[in-house]
Amino acid sequence: MKKWIAGAACALASWHALALQPYVNGGKLAAADLAGAVAMVEQKLSGAGLTVLGVHMAKGLPKQATVVVSDAGMADAIKGIGGSAVVGLPIRVGVKADGSVSYANLEYWQRAYLRKDYGKAEPAVKAAAVKLEQALGGGPAFGGDVKTEDLANYRYMFGMERFDSGNSLLKEYANFDDAVKAVRDNLAKGVKATSKVYEVVVPERKIAVFGVAMNDPEYGEGWWVNKIGADHVAALPWEVFVVNGKVHALYGRYRTALAWPSLGMGQFMGISIHPDRTREMLEAVAGVQ
């Protein structure tokens, strides 16, 4: 019996060693309010050599925020890969009003986003992860296990989208500059109650990524995140990315599942209209009439 228990424990440990979770807990801050906590996080991240791109405070989620940053080394590696890899350039850090901090587990997200090219960026990804841990602390990971080997081709279940599913394409323009201008203009107009959180444009590689706040009171982030659980603070904001003249956004059934991999089917069904409603908002950002 003891041997069986020991064997089971080893098997469980082996499973966890081969699986990753999307978020890492940081150390708790002694901030008195959300604004103070955000300011402290920005200071810590800047002090670690990371560049603050923007701050996202989602409508309907008043007790949390996301600080979005970039790391020069990881950004250079992603620019070198090019194409859709640009969606992995921003790093999301979640902050709560009670001082709780969490951040994206970079290995998890970059294995999913860079896929077969992950190895090219791995040293830079690991170096950026060290900076995050030094700045914010490194507690236990959380959010739901996904086997490391499954991330490059991840989907929640049979029939659902993967990273490269065709319905990520929102609109195609004649060239890169036209595509970027359309996204910028539409975010400035606030189409479909959206707004810009950040942008990173790399004209020499013809790639760009924009963070998009979806502020619609009925179908925006506050609605569906509150239904499935707001602890995954560093899941937001969503991205629109441009490659050459094409504007893309990861489809909701993929992007949401990747950010909440332990979500039950019943919870998914409770937000079943979220992927299409979100796509409609992002289509408007892309310039779809």
Residue ranges and their predicted role:
Residues 1-4:
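Positively charged n-region of N-terminal signal peptides that target proteins for export
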Residues 14-16:
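N-terminal signal peptide c-region/cleavage motif recognized by signal peptidases
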Residues 19-29, 111-114, 160-167, 250, ...:
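Acidic/histidine-rich, surface-exposed loop or edge segments in extracytoplasmic proteins
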Residues 37, 41, 121-128, 132, ...:
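Stable alpha-helical elements in mature extracytoplasmic
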Residues 101-143:
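Hydrophobic alpha-helical segments and helix pairs
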